[in-house]
Amino acid sequence: MKDTDIKRLLYTNLLCVFSIFLSIFIPSFFVDNFSVLEAHLTWLCICSASVTTVNLLSYLVVKPNVSSKRSSLSHKVTRALKCCVCFLMSCFLLHIIFVLYGAPLIELVLETFLFAVVLSTFTTVPCLCLLGPNLKAWLRVFSRNGVTSIWENSLQITTISSFTGAWLGAFPIPLDWERPWQVWPISCTLGATFGYVAGLVISPLWIYWNRKQLTYKNN
């Protein structure tokens, strides 16, 4: 493991963090009195688009998981379509899970679905960029001692931190503080966002700190 690889990971992750800050501040130049809380649905769409774009561009430029086999154009198109289908499936699956855990079934459907979209953006999109629509690779990465690179280590950390942040964000909702951010699903989306950002920042630092203990198996 080289320090240059960890630096590449750090810079890539910081770009993703920067994309979230852009989604917060850029709309205020075009929309009067723009606020993440007051225009929350709009911000969720902007944030998802921004993070997805940066993830795609980063992985296309950095290419952390380059295959030695040269694939045809039709194979690349098929792979891209499969990734889109997987992303949509993850959005609907998360939406169903949220409803099963107590989210409104009929009311606030759009809010719940956009929460599923943004959480899928933080978790599924990086997995698809790095691993593709390969179920075996996903199971390997998220199993014990299954990672083969620092990029997969970072993927583990950011995915877990995003879900943890979303879960912790649900705790303030039933409290009688009467704050605007307690409305479903604002606290959960903010929790997921903070968790994602924390994972992006912590993962390169954790990998650097434990670089001597970390060993990776070849694919």
From Swiss-Prot:
Protein name per the record: GPI ethanolamine phosphate transferase, stabilizing subunit
Family: Belongs to the PIGF family.
Membrane-spanning ranges: 11-31, 42-62, 86-106, 113-133, 155-175, 189-209
GO CC, any one term: endoplasmic reticulum membrane
Subunit description: Part of the ethanolamine phosphate transferase 3 complex composed by PIGO and PIGF. Part of the ethanolamine phosphate transferase 2 complex with PIGG. PIGF is required to stabilize PIGG and PIGO.
GO biological process terms, semicolon-separated: GPI anchor biosynthetic process
The organism of origin for this protein: Mus musculus
Subcellular location: Endoplasmic reticulum membrane
Keyword Endoplasmic reticulum among record annotations: yes
Gene: Pigf
Any GO MF annotation of the entry: mannose-ethanolamine phosphotransferase activity
Major place of residence: endoplasmic reticulum
Assigned keywords, A-Z: Endoplasmic reticulum, GPI-anchor biosynthesis, Membrane, Transmembrane, Transmembrane helix
Annotated pathway: Glycolipid biosynthesis; glycosylphosphatidylinositol-anchor biosynthesis
Any Pfam family the entry gives: PIG-F
Membrane topology note: Multi-pass membrane protein
Role played: Stabilizing subunit of the ethanolamine phosphate transferase 3 and ethanolamine phosphate transferase 2 complexes that sequentially transfer an ethanolamine phosphate (EtNP) from a phosphatidylethanolamine (PE) to the 6-OH position of the third alpha-1,2-linked mannose and the second alpha-1,6-linked mannose of the alpha-D-Man-(1->2)-alpha-D-Man-(1->6)-2-PEtn-alpha-D-Man-(1->4)-alpha-D-GlcN-(1->6)-(1-radyl,2-acyl-sn-glycero-3-phospho)-2-acyl-inositol (also termed H6) intermediate to generate a 6-PEtn-alpha-D-Man-(1->2)-6-PEtn-alpha-D-Man-(1->6)-2-PEtn-alpha-D-Man-(1->4)-alpha-D-GlcN-(1->6)-(1-radyl,2-acyl-sn-glycero-3-phospho)-2-acyl-inositol (also termed H8).
